[in-house]
Amino acid sequence: TDETKMQTATFRLHVFRTDRANFYMKLDDGVLHIACPSQTDFADERVQKLLKDFIEQALRHEARRLLPSRLLDLASRHGFTCTDVKIFNSKSHWGSCTPRRSINLSLSLMLLPWHLIDYVLLHELCHTIEMNHSDRFWALMDKVTEGKALELRKELKKYHML
């Protein structure tokens, strides 16, 4: 609706009514503008799906633009290597790491604050060394998060995927 509020790591959402006949979106200067025809029924399931699709497109764009380079920067800083980075639309996992050290990241990461995005990226990078959640894995997580792994893990649980 006109009062829709949403803030992501890189943009805020601005949904508004317009005299135009069609929906359109534009990501500009940290704002995702979604224009809706003046008679739009926001309770309509088709409208809800369209708005969600627009938001997913913007999240995917931002995730592809920012996450691979951020992951590689963190990898370099902490001495990790990964073979590939992919962005996908997972509804159940923030990220995953394959035995070949390929890291998959959910576009929903862009809904998190940056310190939690970094936590997830570091979590997946730690899996390039420890493929399970053993004590060695958590010791490594504590090392790269300056002893805050458990605190960050608890904070992450407060967030939901798109």
Located regions from the model:
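Walker B beta-strand of ABC/ABC-like P-loop ATPase nucleotide-binding domains
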Residues: 121
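Walker B catalytic acidic pair
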Residues: 124
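Active-site-proximal or metal-binding-adjacent scaffold patches in catalytic folds
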Residues: 1-118, 128-162
